[in-house]
């Protein structure tokens, strides 16, 4: 029988993007607030949006960053890196260029002290296999993000899982993104549309349309996905709000994934990191559109001892509530869910460091 997991509480600074872009806080200020407000001990950061000149990181800056993390009492969990094969205007990266591009980011993660690099779905099985020895050399686990409109049992994800099994490297795995298993259209986004003048009739039909697709489950293929996207656009147009159509489609099909919680069991042994994506907390102190309690229970029951980075995506549209208050409330739900599952979340720094070190593979003498 699998021992119950004790996930590590954490947050990604992506949750505070509005405050960062509004220059309420710089990177250091956000890190200090994360520690002071008890959102850690786990800390996740996005490389390109947080570190000037990334992935080029000099020794002095890396030293300053590591010292800051130690000073405030956090533990680095995951560095979100990019796998954008379209960085050139006129062509896509070839395989060799992609490996070089990713290698620079893996080295940066190691230099900054991150044990995980979150990579994106544009990385295919051949590339992940080629990157495995590079990840091993630098002691960085590559955790590909399973993000809506993908889901755990999607053919592309299963192909990666099967390749991981073939390669046999403990440095390859997945980042579980809760946005793939959403159970309702986010009420906070409905409120944002209301504030943009959408009629109650239109908003009701948006929710009804999403609920219909939820009952059907994930799209069968890209054609089905495209049809769903188009139906949101058509709905907006019929109600005289074509300006909202693309937004409905992006969120309805690419942010709120309709897979079921149990779908994650398909790749559970390969989940190395978790994005605890959510969109808001209601008046009852619960997340009304993401089954947080069921997701935490599944992780606990599967012996998950890695970090959960609370990832508040509602900042894109919710300008009237504090993201810091919302993160605090959502993490309370996670802790309550872990206790209800017979376990707990790790909030102690020393425990988190020890547990994360045991959870992830390491390479003796790994260096940047």
From Swiss-Prot:
This protein's record includes keyword Metal-binding: yes
Summary of temperature dependence: Optimum temperature is around 40 degrees Celsius.
Residues annotated as binding a divalent metal cation: 145, 177, 275, 311
pH dependence: Optimum pH is 6.0.
Subunit structure and binding partners: Heterodimer composed of an alpha subunit (CarB) and a beta subunit (CarC).
Organism the protein comes from: Microbacterium trichothecenolyticum (Aureobacterium trichothecenolyticum)
Cofactor: a divalent metal cation
Gene3D superfamilies: Divalent-metal-dependent TIM barrel enzymes
Protein name per its UniProtKB record: C-glycoside deglycosidase alpha subunit
Active-site positions on this chain: 147 (proton acceptor)
Its EC number(s): 4.1.99.-
MF terms in GO: lyase activity; metal ion binding
Role this protein plays: Carbon-carbon bond-cleaving enzyme which participates in the metabolism of C-glycosides. Acts on the C6-glycosylated compounds 3''-dehydroisovitexin (3''-oxo-isovitexin) and 3''-dehydroisoorientin (3''-oxo-homoorientin). Shows weak activity with 3'-dehydromangiferin (3'-oxo-mangiferin).
Reactions accelerated catalytically: 3''-dehydroisovitexin = 1,5-anhydro-D-erythro-hex-1-en-3-ulose + apigenin; 3''-dehydroisoorientin = 1,5-anhydro-D-erythro-hex-1-en-3-ulose + luteolin
């Amino acid at each position: 029988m699998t021992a119950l997991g004790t996930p590590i509480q954490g947050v990604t600074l992506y949750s505070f993007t509005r405050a960062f872009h509004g220059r309420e806080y710089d990177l250091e200020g956000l890190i200090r607030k994360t520690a002071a407000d008890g959102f850690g001990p786990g800390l996740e950061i996005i490389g390109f949006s947080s570190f000037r000149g990334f992935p080029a990181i000099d020794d002095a800056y890396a030293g300053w960053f590591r010292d800051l993390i130690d000073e405030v009492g956090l533990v680095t969990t995951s560095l979100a890196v990019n796998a954008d094969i379209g960085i050139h205007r006129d062509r896509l990266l070839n395989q060799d260029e992609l490996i070089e591009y990713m290698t620079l980011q893996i080295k940066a993660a190691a230099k900054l002290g991150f044990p995980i690099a979150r990579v994106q779905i544009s990385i295919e099985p051949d590339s992940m296999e080629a990157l495995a020895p590079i990840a091993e050399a630098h002691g960085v686990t590559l955790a590909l993000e399973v993000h809506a409109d993908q889901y755990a049992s999607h053919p592309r994800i299963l192909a990666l899982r099967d390749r991981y099994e073939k390669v046999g490297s403990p440095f390859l795995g997945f980042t579980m993104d809760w946005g793939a298993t959403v159970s309702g259209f986010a009420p906070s986004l409905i409120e944002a549309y209301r504030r943009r003048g959408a009629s109650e009739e239109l908003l009701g039909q948006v929710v009804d349309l999403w609920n219909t697709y939820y009952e059907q489950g994930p799209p069968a293929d890209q054609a089905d996905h495209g049809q769903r996207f188009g139906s949101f656009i058509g709905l907006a147009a019929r109600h005289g709000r074509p300006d909202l159509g693309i937004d409905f489609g992006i969120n309805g099909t690419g942010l709120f994934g309709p897979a079921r919680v149990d779908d994650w069991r398909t790749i559970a042994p390969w989940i190395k990191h978790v994005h605890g994506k959510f969109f808001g907390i209601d008046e009852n102190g619960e997340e009304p559109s993401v089954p947080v309690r069921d997701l935490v229970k599944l992780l606990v029951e599967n012996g998950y001892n890695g970090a959960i980075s609370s990832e508040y995506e509602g900042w894109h549209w919710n300008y009237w509530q504090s993201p810091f208050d919302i993160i605090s409330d959502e993490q309370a739900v996670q802790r309550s869910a872990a206790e209800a599952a017979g376990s707990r979340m790790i909030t102690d720094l020393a425990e988190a460091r020890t547990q994360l070190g045991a959870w992830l593979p390491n390479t003796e003498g790994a260096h940047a």
